[in-house]
Amino acid sequence: MTTGVGNRVTTITAAALEAIRAHGVQTFPDECCGALIDVGGVIVDAFALPNTTTSGAARRFQIGPRDYRASEARATELRGALAGFYHSHPNHPARPSQHDLDQAWPNFSYVIISVNAAVPGDITCWHLKDDRSAFEQGELICPTES
């Protein structure tokens, strides 16, 4: 796992982190995507969602309105909150693209996993700057993983 240098810290359980890794491998060479559910200040669930893009799933992801609502329902079911989203970058670094920036919403965490040749790699966490001009890398910590 790669941690960032920003001042925002996102804590995630080992189970949620493993779910992101597994989803990235399962969908390779396409991008995976899903929702991050926070309960008590910790991401406890990485809720897999279908990638509904029509612009080439190997380079893009899209979460449709129905799946967004399903994410909110999952958060309510867990008595938590929708904290953000995750997706994979097949055969590319775990850094946000311009497309990621263009599609991002404020106040969410964005976790990106690099999956190279179907092997999970670095995982990073990003937050949209208040002026929406860029992402700032945050720190992703998993208390039970070193």
Predicted features along the sequence, with ranges:
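Conserved beta-strand-loop surface patch within small alpha/beta domains used
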Residues: 1-82, 90-146
